[in-house]
Amino acid sequence: MSAELAPPPPLAPGGLRVTALGGISEIGRNMTVFEHLGRLLIVDCGVLFPGHDEPGVDLILPDLRHIEDRLDEIEALVVTHAHEDHIGAIPFLLKLRPDIPVVGSKFTIALVREKCREHRLKPKFVEVAERQSSQHGVFECEYFAVNHSIPGCLAVAIHTGAGTVLHTGDIKLDQLPLDGRPTDLPGMSRLGDAGVDLFLCDSTNSEHPGVSPSESEVGPTLHRLIRGAEGRVIVACFASNVDRVQQIIDAAVALGRRVSFVGRSMVRNMGIARELGYLKVDDSDILDIAAAEMMPPDRVVLITTGTQGEPMAALSRMSRGEHRSITLTSGDLIILSSSLIPGNEEAVYGVIDSLSKIGARVVTNAQARVHVSGHAYAGELLFLYNGVRPRNVMPVHGTWRHLRANAALAASTGVPPENIVLAENGVSVDLVAGRASISGAVTVGKMFVDGLITGDVGDATLGERLILSSGFVSITVVVHRGTGRPAGPAHLISRGFSEDPKALEPVAQKVERELEALAADNVTDPTRIAQAVRRTVGKWVGETYRRQPMIVPTVIEI
């Protein structure tokens, strides 16, 4: 879509422009820029983790180049919650302008502060809470409690002269939240009474009918599984899911076990959660990892990171026998208390297989209710639309199928189809005279963090890395100058392809036959010989191993 649109014209006087630099037509790297009267307000600034087709990339950022020449116009960065796909890129934005005010709840600011400390940044923080407001230049922001899978989530209503925009962030309507803080649907409905001109709504689970299960349903399942375990229990979950960790701790303590946190982010986040009063556990019930290893197996529960098969996460290292403190044994119970993020299937199943090989019992959400989503299902989104009654809707936080499903829900509640705007990253949506419409698009791409380098990593570079990930085969042939006939056997070397030294012997014979055929056809040009050798080796490797390694032929004339 964005490639087909012209750049947006100057914003109409008094209008409001909304441009997502990430998070629309994808799930991750959420960042939305609001423009009014020449000033900017940013909501969220997150990262996307690379897929298998982006080797060597550490993180993917929103395209910050769009605002690099307008940094002085930014009034504030409002953060809806502290998940990585909403805060992970904040240090990279602050390196461009360190004094941008960062606005968020107590828990959100605590995690952002730790992240910025790792980058040696000391931002200006503005702490807010639900039922409060803050003024940032021409933008007045009003905050509403939101239930999700991390403490301190907020929806934000942005009041401007052009109208009111309500951004849900990540949202769920859990009616039995463990922290006693349900999504403030009454408050949002009162906002709807006053008039919501544009509603940016979470689309993640818009395809799921009905209502999402409550987080409170997970606790009894965890209690039952831990009670039935005869040995050690290891529960893997997201390091930010404080309510989940609280339920694990409650079950463990009730069953006479003590707990230990494993993984840097888990230790850090739970330390912050305890300090701020979100996680309640006695000191006597917590062990460090060394003490936990000395405990009888049936008296300890380890709470660890690694739910997505991340190679360096604690659970993955345990599965490979590489964790410096924990050695898994047959009889351990491993509970994966998380969802499977699309794209991570191979890594997660690989970890599960490794755990099963050791003899551990692995329980996932497929076998028992050990996880529930933090995003609203379709039935909950209908409640939101009927409560807010927006004039215009812009689905966010989802791929195209999620956005379209969310748009259909909005239409079913009476929002006119012409007032539902389906956009993607880079597309500008202008709110003028109470009507939202697409005005154009700016060019946005992906900003890659690749080691110490931040910027573009082109398709050609990623393509080369993908080829290298399949291995490397070097072929050296010596031919007589003038005739092209082989002067000796072909010499092949492989790296990252096969450990069998004889694996390439059949193709060496094929290369020699190809050289004889070329000489018979009077082909003597070294470049043409090299091309033929590459084709011969590539075809054989593809047919034999279903691999496409990098193939480098060298032709030496004598």
From Swiss-Prot:
Pfam families per the UniProt record, alphabetical: Lactamase_B_2 (PF12706), RMMBL (PF07521), RNase_J_b_CASP (PF22505), RNase_J_C (PF17770)
Binding site residues for substrate: 371-375
UniProt keyword list: Cytoplasm, Endonuclease, Exonuclease, Hydrolase, Metal-binding, Nuclease, RNA-binding, rRNA processing, Zinc
Cofactor note: Binds up to 2 Zn(2+) ions per subunit. It is not clear if Zn(2+) or Mg(2+) is physiologically important.
GO cellular component term, pick one: cytoplasm
Entry-linked CDD domains: RNaseJ_MBL-fold (cd07714)
Required cofactor(s): Zn(2+)
GO molecular function: 5'-3' RNA exonuclease activity; RNA binding; RNA endonuclease activity; zinc ion binding
Subcellular location field: Cytoplasm
Major localization class: cytoplasm
GO BP of this protein: rRNA processing
Family: Belongs to the metallo-beta-lactamase superfamily. RNA-metabolizing metallo-beta-lactamase-like family. Bacterial RNase J subfamily.
Assembly behavior: Homodimer.
Protein name stated in the entry: Ribonuclease J
Organism, scientific name: Mycolicibacterium smegmatis (strain ATCC 700084 / mc(2)155)
Highest classification ranks of the organism: Bacteria, Bacillati, Actinomycetota, Actinomycetes, Mycobacteriales
